[in-house]
Amino acid sequence: TRLAALLEAHPEVNPHYLELEILETSALNDIRKVSDTMNACLDLGVRFALDDFGTGYSSLTYLKRLPAHLIKIDQSFVRGMLEDADDLSIVEGVVGLAKAFQLEVIAEGVETIDHGLSLLQLGCELAQGYGIARPMPAGNLPEWALNWKADDDWLAINLTEAS
């Protein structure tokens, strides 16, 4: 495959550090083909995340049939979870599904400290969004990683009790 050839041409790239995202809606067309392709990539050491989870029509089918290790909760649910009980229920349900299927879960669209706090209380430890960092050039990432500090309220959450 093309990916195998690229990895072979660049042995300095460890495929275990590569994660490809599959948009839930893009897998609708041919789940068998998508699954076969994902399995071929897994054989190379590449991992997968299901992106925008909850926005498609067959989310549970994807959890069962696609070999992903991570679910990314769509930002539309995360952003509204503090004001909308339905969005909160969806986020809570997706976190529960991830745990049931022994998958990692990451919340997209974490805009505020309160979003992060709520997610931690639900047992979701991974997040991305402007509340953590704005997009930045790759060259700025090392300095950001050295200087970033989680909010004290986030650090105060006992993750064993929250899960």
Question: Residues of each region from the PLM?
Answer:
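Catalytic core of soluble alpha/beta enzymes
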Residues: 35-38, 42
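EAL-family c-di-GMP phosphodiesterase catalytic domain
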Residues: 17-31, 44-163
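Short glycine/threonine-rich loop-to-helix capping motif typified by GTGT followed
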Residues: 1, 33-34
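Aromatic/hydrophobic pocket-lining residues that form π-stacking "cages" and hydrophobic walls in ligand
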Residues: 3, 37, 94
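Charged DNA-binding/catalytic regions of mobile-element recombinases
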Residues: 9, 43
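Short, well-ordered amphipathic alpha-helices
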Residues: 1-8, 116
